[in-house]
Regions:
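Short Lys/Arg-enriched alpha/beta "domain-start" segment
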Residues: 2-97
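Charged, amphipathic alpha-helical linker segments immediately N-terminal to NTP-binding catalytic cores
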Residues: 135-178
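Pre-Walker A adenine-sensing motif
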Residues: 177-190
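Conserved alpha-helical scaffold flanking the Walker A/P-loop in AAA+ ATPase domains
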Residues: 233-261, 272-282
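Short glycine-rich substrate-engagement loop in P-loop NTPases that contacts/grips substrate
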Residues: 177-179, 218-249, 268-269
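Conserved catalytic/switch belt of AAA+ P-loop NTPases
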Residues: 259-293, 297-308
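Walker A/P-loop nucleotide-binding motif
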Residues: 193-210
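C-terminal alpha-helical "lid" subdomain
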Residues: 83, 98-101, 314-384
Length: 384
């Protein structure tokens, strides 16, 4: 009798309409997935799964985000529900799309999460949405950064955003490499070794080189590389970020300002062992990369275990440029205009300086040209 009563109660629960409550707060970006989950449960309840295909694609456009989302809402041919400026739900027969957008300085990025009844409909919908975004769509590959940090209360926090992989590096900015910079990047991306350490003072081009590497990884992957990023010492002292990298889908782990993390373990470094396990393949991370940037002046201060062959691809000191190297960089950026290159270099460094950073040269390039002073004709003294 008790079993029969329990079964009757279970049947009553099944007959109840499915409902879900939502908190409209900072998690509004997840509303599309909540709606989709509701539909999935209903479909399973009647044994009719309607959305077996899932795709996630990204793009960027060099126009205001509001314009892009207005066009997606009005011109996609799908029923649209705008949640706020950068969040949109699109719905049609056999297809459902959640769109999230982010503003950048010179472009906006969009992430499309799409569910469809079949592959053909999914591909056709993606192509239609890209056409709506229009000719302003950035053709460069994107990479996705998951930034881990601590908030003002000391609690773990994160932010995820897309970056356009359009960084163009010139060899003249990296004379310390024994090969063209693109060749160096390609060798690292394809190498079995996971670790790359970039040493040097701020402004020498370490971050620019990291971005170019992530762009190359995206192009090689044929999709957006997923990057775990932090510069927070406290975050790295927790096991969770390492567990997420090992068990997740990230293609690279970038640790900036990692001075304390790279010092010798005999000097009290208790955090390096986690990276050694990942870099050594104790846990499987084939094809994934560990990139460190540090202000440590030379590799002699780094724990030797991290530099071991087979584990470390290279430890590169990205230094400041000599005056001659700075002039060659300026000349390259000025397309061979020697007069302009001399003005750029003069703006980037004082006459008593021996070195200049690549950042100082790039900054001088962005400054408007100074007008050339016009010489005044000599004054003629009037005579009686």
């Amino acid at each position: 009798m008790e079993q029969v009563i329990n079964e009757m109660n279970m049947n009553k629960e099944i007959d109840k309409p499915f409902s879900v409550s939502l908190s409209f707060n900072d998690h509004m970006r997840d509303l599309g997935e909540a709606v989709m989950n509701t539909r999935v449960v209903r479909a399973l309840d009647i044994a009719a799964a309607s959305y077996p295909i899932h795709r996630q694609v990204r793009c960027a456009a060099r126009r205001p985000m509001e314009q892009v989302f207005d066009d997606l809402a009005l011109k996609s041919g799908l029923a649209a529900q705008r949640l706020y400026a950068g969040s949109l739900l699109l719905d049609g027969p056999g297809v459902f799309v959640q769109v999230n957008g982010y503003r950048k300085l010179t472009y906006c990025s969009c992430t499309f999460k799409l569910w469809a009844r079949d592959i053909a409909l999914a591909e056709a919908t993606i192509a239609k949405l890209f056409r709506v975004v229009g000719d302003d769509r950035v053709r460069s590959q994107l990479f996705v950064v998951e930034w881990r940090m601590r908030d003002r209360d000391g609690d773990a926090a994160s932010a995820t955003f897309e970056e356009v992989a359009d960084d163009v590096l010139v060899d003249e900015a990296y004379p310390m490499l024994a090969e063209p910079v693109d060749q160096f990047i390609d060798r690292y991306v394809q190498a079995p070794e996971s670790v790359l350490i970039l040493l040097g003072p701020p402004g020498t081009g370490k971050t620019r080189l990291v971005r170019a590497i992530l762009g190359a990884m995206s192009r090689r992957k044929g999709d957006s590389a997923e990057v775990l990023y932090t510069a927070d010492k406290q975050v790295l002292r927790s096991d969770s970020i390492f567990v997420d990298f090992v068990t997740g889908s990230h293609d690279a782990f970038v640790i900036e300002d990692a001075d304390y993390l790279l010092q010798s373990r005999t000097d009290g470094n208790a955090d390096l062992h986690r990276f050694l396990m990942v870099a050594d393949g104790v846990v499987r991370t084939e094809g994934r990369k560990l990139l460190f940037t540090t202000n440590v002046p030379n590799a002699g201060a780094i724990d030797e275990a991290l530099l071991r062959p087979g584990r470390c691809f290279a430890a590169v000191t990205v230094r400041r440029l000599t005056r001659d190297e700075g002039h060659r960089l300026a000349l390259r950026l000025c397309d061979g205009d020697a007069a302009r290159a001399s003005r750029v270099l003069a703006s980037a460094m004082r006459t008593d300086q021996r070195t200049v950073s690549a950042a100082e040269v790039y900054q001088a390039m962005r400054q408007p040209p100074q007008p050339v002073a016009q010489s005044m004709p000599p004054r003629v003294r009037a005579t009686a």
